[in-house]
Amino acid sequence: MVSSLARYAFNIYGDTRPRERPRRLEYPCERELTCLSQLQRPGQPPVVILGGKNCLRMLALNADNTAVVADSSIVDSARTPQKLFSVNTLKCTSDLVACGLANGTVQVYQVTSGGKNRLAYKLQDHKRVVNSLDFVDDSVLVSGSQDGTVKVWDLRTFSPRPVMQLAASHHSDPVRSCQASAHCRVRGKTTVLSVHDSGALCKFDLRATAGVGAGVGAGAGAGALLPERKWTFHSGPALSLHIHPDAEYVLTGGRDRKICVWHYGEAGSHSVAPLSIVNTYGPVMKVRWCTVAAQDPVEPTLDLPDAPDPSCLYNYDFACSYLNDDATISVYNLRRRYIPKAVVASPMRKPVQNFVWVASRTDRRLFSISKANVLVAHDLDVNDVDITRPLDNMPAVATAWRPGYANVSIVSQHKNDFELGDPVADSRDTSFDDTRDDLSHSRSTPPKERPPIVRQSTQFTVASLKSQSPVLHQRGMDSSVRDSSARAMDLSGRGLDLPPPVRPSLPRNPSQSTQGSQSSGAAHSKSLPHAPSPYVAALSVPIPLADDTVFDILAAEYHISVPDGFSLLDVCQMNARVAASVSRYRDCEIWRMLGVSLEQEFEEHQFDDPRFDGQFEDQHTDPQNASGSQHSEKDIDTKSVSSYLGNFVGSFNSNSTSTTNYGGPHRSDSATSMNKALFGSKEREGKEGKDIKHGKREKEIEQGLESPKELNPLSTRRKDSDSKANNADSSALDKPGDKSLDRSALDRSAPTSFRNKSLLQTSDGETPKDNNLSDEIHAYEPRNNLSTKVSLSTMSSQKSKAIDIKAPRRYSNNAMSASMSPEIFASSESPLKHIAKLSPSRSQTGHSWSIPSSSHDLDDENMPASVSGSLASSGYMGGPDSRSGITGTSFHSNPRSHPSFSSHRSSLTSGRSSFVTNRSGFYSSQVQPAPQLLEKVEEFSISSAEPKTSELTKAMRKKKFSYEELESSEANEKPWSLINLLEKAVIYARDQGDLVMCCTLILLFHDLFKKIFSNRILSDNACLECLALYVDTLRGKCLFTTAVNVVKEAPSSLNYKLAVYASKDVDMRYYCCWCEKLLVNETSKAKFGPNSENFGYWYCDSCSRRQSNCIYCGEPCRGLTVVVSLNCGHRGHFGCLQEWFLDEQSTGCPGGCEYVMD
């Protein structure tokens, strides 16, 4: 039942009628169409003529040009033999239709309203295709052909031969378009214009009869009339021309994507350049003036009989179609010649073949034909889906900035405003009548009175702002802007009336006044008055964060890669130093913060493991070790260097006590090298570096131990007095044959159970010969080296080269760097180099680029657990019963560090200078046991049957530090983690527009984190966009070397795309050194030819002056690739300057100026 009633359903709210689409003419043709024209008959409906391949039809339209009333063929098929013909161009007048064929024939048909058409004239004299036709009047026809001639036909004579032949030159230059001027006949002169494949615009005067009829047909230029005037501006073929409806102006369009406006009258006969140029987005095929004037025409301002008024150029629109399969027609007006007024698209998006304006004085319509063989009428006054208006869709506000001190002009202008450039006529009496001609910003008096613009002064100016950056220097504004602003303020201050503007005054806020409105008023009070422009408000805005000088310094000095022998931490410190040198303190702290976070991330992932702290229990609670420390004074004198130094180095080593033989199993080599570096001289460091090599340690292991005393450095005795304690320590280290130091390196590289010397010593004082000892040591040794290699490969650069250790280096005055030698860092096998890559405060801080007092982790939140275990076990917790009375220095090298590591630890009471303050601490007879951190693990014992696998060994086998693991690490949840800090730094730099900082971070950290960087911080496309913009900016600032380095150091995943983007063709353009105009020299090119020796760019056609000659030989610098410019401004040939600077080894400029080559 429901389904049967559904057919009776209807919309109770009524039907919504669809929006009616405007009616327009669309006529499809079964033949291929190439051209069209209009038959103008007064008092009758318009008639459109279509021509093409085997097609010549006449269409009669209705009054509003929306429908075809009648359709007929002009060619009578009954009388005309059936043969192929192709119509290439059409022109109509009165009742005559002239068509140019592809075989060079011109046929003229006479049409009637009754449909009786006949062939009236058949003109055959062209050798090639006819490209253009035009009627001078009803009896004179002009035709232009591909054979390079323009022929004039007199239809009254019925002669098949032309009465006159015109040619651009004596050689064949194909004619693309020609037209007779209707404005010159008033003075009894007939003018014909033509454009050619050479890009030339030729003007012919038909009154000159020299050579007319002589040698006709003998050649293109034989007996032909040459042009009266010839202009050449197009760089390629000129394809179309059209004369203005009211004045002696002509449009020319060419393949060079330019539309030129020329004045071909007597007043403009001496001009060498077009009046106006419109740049289009495609090669121009056809160009046409509109026959209907604009709705708001510009009134004439000049009344001269021989010069047309330029205002008529703005009263008419013009349209153009494009070559190369473009499906649009662009409509322009010289009021806004940079943006099309309308863009008409073909309905089927097929390329436009030809178009004409409708011959009407009321409607602005276009007839167009496309390669779809469809005739379409477009009404520009109605809204059509195929017509777009870019001016209506454009935003009303547009801004453009230049980095640094930007001189900004705020323009307030309506879309229909235009500039005529007319002289000023001010008739009002002022006290400045004698300087009225000097008013450069004045405008002509408008038809009606309008209030003048009075610029108000402000209390807050940009000049009152002081730059926050000391490197920014005050740059003056442009003199014209400054002078106009100051003089305008001076006039308004005196109460003088300014010349009235062309439009009503613009509302201005006080903040829109210029920079010089107050500060420059007094200085220019006696200057000539100038009226400000009613359209432009000029001001200067300083941008400290985008200063050119700072940009150049940062771009050139920032390290975008890790140099050989340095680490990423060192690069962060060096970049921080560069940022601080230009007062970019925020960037400086960002670099420091990233370096500290990078170090902490490494330490947490490498050492923050509870199993490492458990290795110290068996050493502190062993009774044999406790009793061994109470032997004699000589035993106590040989305590570890770390205990002797206090907490200065021991805190960094994290395992330093008097009973653990200074150093843990995971950083033993580094710890030994650190102590040697602190007390050894430069000569001794080279020997010690050899002693700690892996090869020598392995050799000593194979030879065995000579005595138990050599195994345990605590058994080494010294007989020096207390007053020579420091010297005794240094002398003990200076002995090259001291085996205790060699064995200490061995002990630290062995497992923890072997460093428990009480378990390895027997009652007779000898070391038990256990085969498992050497096996265990050899099994451990490669794993330790592997761990060091993994860390080094992760933190340092991929390539490593030897550094000259003899090179002089500067060091800072802190206690730590004063004791370090650069040779230790330069040693390729030194473990200290590994430590130098882990911490900026422990590595090469002594270099000249290091930043003193660089702090990190000031509140000790992220102190590794191994450090806390070392402090607890070494007796530095404080208290009267501490077994070591020496007070250590602070954990950090920063003198502002906190006195305590955390709330539950005792503070260290002395500074870094108190290495030995109380010798009685060495003789304490009782050692307090270390606090129980983890359950004791018995790794090896003599009583056990088989040795157990060390937990440290298991950890080192599995522990491999990699930054890619940070993506899933819990440390990323911390706001101060490296990933979070890097993300914030990159995003902030990107949002602030700081290209240097953003791109430097990308170049340094992208390959380090790879997937983390792309997934979390910036995608690869965003990174590529930033780097490409950075490269373009560097090239724009002439920093080409830096731009090349950025491309070379780009991340591996972006290097290829960035290199392809950066490798673009470079267009070199030279400007005149005198008039500063572009060296085009088209006049000389047309006169001498492009391959002539007289043509070049060592002179300027605009100012007729020669450019600077070679400073060495005095000859002109001909060519574009042989000129080498110096910084002093002189130039010369490449060979001449090579001979002067390279062969003769001269350093000064050949011109004798004070310039000296670096």
Curated annotation (Swiss-Prot):
GO terms for molecular function: zinc ion binding. The keyword Transcription does not apply. GO terms for cellular component: cytosol; GATOR2 complex; vacuolar membrane. Residues 455-471, 750-765, 784-800, 840-855 have a biased composition (Polar residues). Residues 505-526, 890-909 have a biased composition (Low complexity). Gene3D superfamilies: YVTN repeat-like/Quinoprotein amine dehydrogenase. It comes from the Eukaryota. Pfam families: WD40. InterPro entries: WD40/YVTN_repeat-like_dom_sf (IPR015943), WD40_repeat_CS (IPR019775), WD40_repeat_dom_sf (IPR036322), WD40_rpt (IPR001680), WDR24 (IPR037590), Znf_RING (IPR001841). It is found in: Vacuole. A zinc finger (RING-type) spans 1110-1153. Residues 421-529, 610-637, 678-808, 837-909 are annotated as: Disordered. Keywords: Metal-binding, Repeat, Vacuole, WD repeat, Zinc, Zinc-finger. WD repeats lie at residues 80-119, 125-163, 170-214, 233-272, 293-342. CDD domains: mRING-H2-C3H3C2_Mio-like. May be involved in a process influencing telomere capping. Belongs to the WD repeat RTC1 family. This is Restriction of telomere capping protein 1. It comes from Clavispora lusitaniae (strain ATCC 42720). The lineage of its organism: Eukaryota, Fungi, Dikarya, Ascomycota, Saccharomycotina.
